[in-house]
């Protein structure tokens, strides 16, 4: 989870995981990232359990990281001014810029060394230089690296292993008030438009309301709360499913007397790969 301070990141993180991160209305309330484990909702597990009657149900899980709130200048270790006006597009621009600068720093730290090695005839270094320079050219234009594609498997592997921040797939989450939880508002519409232009996913969620829902003890109470808002499913569940799909992850299920268990695999894997 990446975003500016005061936008509901830690509240959202708390809803997604069992951990309780500090949700403070000031910058850098967290310096180190918060780590949590979330369960992937899957209605099939309970249905299978009704048939098999296992000793336990084990859902699929994945890790989630709440990065300390980014601010303009964060890539240089700078702090935050006093600007708290709501402008999601400006927020996005700040985040993009900071991540791009960090990626450029990563690239430039390697490029000089790799050029020297490539000049000596090293084939792998030449591939690395090709990839680094392609990314550098795009980032210097103020664009994210995820738009860069490579033709050869060697280049693709090098690109993957760089783990640049702006190559990662994006799901934009627009945090709104309770009244806008179903349809969004003028601000979330702006985010949806820019996400569509980028071919990215976008969704609306009311993080504070989700926190209230998560605090309810029974599923019946949660369902009643959602019905009052005109929602069929919690925003948290929708978010987890969207993120799971965005990462090209799917699950298969094994069922027996001991347990009904969901296993995570990458979309496109064949059975031997899934079996490990």
Predicted regions and their residues:
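C-terminal-of-GTPase-core extension/linker across diverse P-loop GTPases
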Residues: 1-2, 7, 13, 113-276
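Switch/coupling subdomain of P-loop NTPase systems
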Residues: 86-109, 181, 189-202
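Generic alpha-helical segment signature
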Residues: 41, 88, 100-103, 125-128, ...
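Conserved G1/Walker A P-loop phosphate-binding module
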Residues: 1-92, 96, 107-108, 113-117
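Flexible, active-site-adjacent loop/turn segments at secondary-structure boundaries
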Residues: 21-29, 43-50, 55-56, 68-69, ...
């Amino acid at each position: 989870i990446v975003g500016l301070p005061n936008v509901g990141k830690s509240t959202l993180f708390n809803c997604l995981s069992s951990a309780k991160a500090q949700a403070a209305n000031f910058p850098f309330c967290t310096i180190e990232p918060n780590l949590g484990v979330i369960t992937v909702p899957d209605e099939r597990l309970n249905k299978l359990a009704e048939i098999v009657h296992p000793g336990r149900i084990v859902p699929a899980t994945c890790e989630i990281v709440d990065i300390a709130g980014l601010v303009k200048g964060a890539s240089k270790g700078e702090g935050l001014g006093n600007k708290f006006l709501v402008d999601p597009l400006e927020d996005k621009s700040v985040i993009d810029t900071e991540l791009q600068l960090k990626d450029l720093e990563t690239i430039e730290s390697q490029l000089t060394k790799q050029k020297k090695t490539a000049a000596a005839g090293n084939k792998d270094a030449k591939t690395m230089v090709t990839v680094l320079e392609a990314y550098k050219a795009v980032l210097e234009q103020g664009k994210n690296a995820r738009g860069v594609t490579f033709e050869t498997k060697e280049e693709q592997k090098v690109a993957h292993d760089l783990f640049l921040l702006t190559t990662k797939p994006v799901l934009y989450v627009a945090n709104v008030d309770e009244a806008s939880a179903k349809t969004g508002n003028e601000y979330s519409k702006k985010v949806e438009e820019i996400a569509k232009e980028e071919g990215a996913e976008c969704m609306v969620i009311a993080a504070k309301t989700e926190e209230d829902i998560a605090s309810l003890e029974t599923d019946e109470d949660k369902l009643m709360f959602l019905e009052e808002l005109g929602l069929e499913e919690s925003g948290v569940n929708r978010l987890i499913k969207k993120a799971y799909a965005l990462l090209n992850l799917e699950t298969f299920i094994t069922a027996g007397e001991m347990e009904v268990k969901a296993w995570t695999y990458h979309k496109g894997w064949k059975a031997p790969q899934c079996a490990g």
